[in-house]
């Protein structure tokens, strides 16, 4: 492990919950930002089909 000596400074009983908690908070913030700044993501989570904005002409 490259950063194995961190546990000589921070106890694993403190460091691991902080690490996992910070990852959880960041994931929640990213999901909130995507949900609040897009219109399609909440529809996707609710199971609605995406609307086709424009048709593609071949040829």
From Swiss-Prot:
Residues 36-59 are periplasmic. One of its GO terms (cellular component) is plasma membrane. Keywords: Antenna complex, Bacteriochlorophyll, Cell inner membrane, Cell membrane, Chlorophyll, Chromophore, Light-harvesting polypeptide, Magnesium, Membrane, Metal-binding, Transmembrane, Transmembrane helix. This is Light-harvesting protein B-800-850 alpha chain E. It is a single-pass type II membrane protein. Pfam families: LHC. Belongs to the antenna complex alpha subunit family. InterPro entries: Antenna_a/b (IPR000066), Antenna_alpha (IPR018332), Antenna_alpha_CS (IPR002361), Light-harvesting_complex (IPR035889). It is found in: Cell inner membrane. The gene is pucAE. It comes from the Bacteria. Changing residue 42 to P: In strain: 2.6.1 / French. The core complex is formed by different alpha and beta chains, binding bacteriochlorophyll molecules, and arranged most probably in tetrameric structures disposed around the reaction center. The non-pigmented gamma chains may constitute additional components. GO terms for biological process: photosynthesis, light reaction. Residues 1-11 are cytoplasmic. GO terms for molecular function: bacteriochlorophyll binding; electron transporter, transferring electrons within the cyclic electron transport pathway of photosynthesis activity; metal ion binding. The chain crosses the membrane at residues 12-35. A bacteriochlorophyll binds at residue 31. Gene3D superfamilies: Light-harvesting complex. Antenna complexes are light-harvesting systems, which transfer the excitation energy to the reaction centers.
């Amino acid at each position: 492990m490259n950063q194995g000596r961190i546990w000589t400074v921070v106890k694993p009983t403190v460091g691991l919950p902080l690490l996992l908690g910070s990852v959880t908070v960041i994931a929640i913030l990213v999901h909130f930002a995507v949900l609040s700044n897009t219109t399609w993501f909440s529809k996707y989570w609710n199971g609605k089909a995406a609307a086709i904005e424009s048709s593609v002409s071949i040829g």
